[in-house]
Amino acid sequence: MERLDAVVIGAGVVGLAAARALALAGREVTVLEAEPRVGMHASSRNSEVIHAGIYYAPGSLKARACVAGRDMLYRYCAERGIAHRRIGKLLVAAHADEVPVLMHYLDTARANGVDDLRVLQREEWRELEPEVEAVAAILSPSTGIVDSHALMTSLLGDLQRAGGTLVCNSPVLGGAPTGGGLRVDVGGADPVRIASRTVVNCAGLRAPQVAAALGTPQAWVPPARFARGHWFALSGASPFRRLVYPMPETGGLGIHVTLDLAGQARFGPDVEWIDRIDYGFPAGREAALRRAIARYYPGIAAREIVPAQCGIRAKTAGPGEPAQDFRIDGPAQHGIPGLVNLFGIESPGLTAALALAEIATAQIADSPRTP
């Protein structure tokens, strides 16, 4: 049985960030990725937004990691030359009954330490975004966009320069706690059984499945809930210069406008609860999406939109259930030395990745190395 020092399961942005943090701390790190390349799931199927920290309950892990991670991510991108823009975002109340919700998010943001939001007068937001129809709006100057692929490439480069290794096409099939860490059974073309003092489960959509396979007590394995979202791209030139977000809906942040680094506008994501990982783009999504967009952008009626992408959010609560916080469960929770499980890392996971990596790896920083 091959013996390793530290194993990270999952090479999405959070897994790569965690592996990088461990490697920079002097650990010998191996990343196991089930897919042929890094970031094939949520890390590359999202809006690529750097969130300010507006929506999340004060004191929650989402709030703390988002605000800290935002600043860390902006610094990291600037230092590494990763394409990003602090483009800003308008939060809009399309109707009068949404104004209290908008003001609630203003209060929430301030409680989270986001102190740069500004309530706009009508003439101000009309000057910023003439196509937007609303009754109230708030500007978030610290919201931005980032090239998530370039970010993952940079994190992987840091990991490899620090001596870490990425092994793709290597799904985790099973395992168990041992006296000095964990056994991990790895599939693929050349199945192998390994022993590692430290295992960090960043498997994203499959994190509950992997946790159970490694022997995590069932009481500490949340259910896997999948919320698929669909994005449509706006054909032709974008009328927007920044992101535009309506008031959130159940399961997501509403059908919002995002811009990529080339300036193309996309609308989405919507929410469709599914029971398995499936990236099919079903027909019939456009009409409902157009209705949602028209509430704050009436000009959508005269514009063509085309299917762009779909992604799946990893959730631990299903439809009709209260939204859940990020979960980072270490030995103090589940009782298995050397194991850290990350669950429900949906939005703002991209923004929070560097902060989550520090929090997760701190739980096993003192784990002994393999002799």
Each model region followed by its residue ranges:
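Glycine-rich FAD pyrophosphate-binding loop
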Residues: 24-45
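Short beta-strand to alpha-helix junction loop
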Residues: 57-68, 92-101, 138-157, 167, ...
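Helical element adjacent to the flavin cofactor pocket in flavoenzyme catalytic cores
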Residues: 138-198
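Glycine-rich phosphate/pyrophosphate-binding beta-alpha loops
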Residues: 55, 143-145, 249-252, 339-353
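Dinucleotide-binding Rossmann-like beta1-alpha1 core, especially the glycine-rich loop
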Residues: 48-124, 134, 254
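C-terminal lid/capping helical subdomain adjacent to the catalytic/cofactor pocket in oxidative enzymes
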Residues: 21, 25, 323-371
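Active-site substrate-recognition segment that forms the wall
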Residues: 21, 50, 82-85, 180, ...
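N-terminal Rossmann-like FAD-binding beta1-loop-alpha1 element of flavoenzymes
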Residues: 4-31
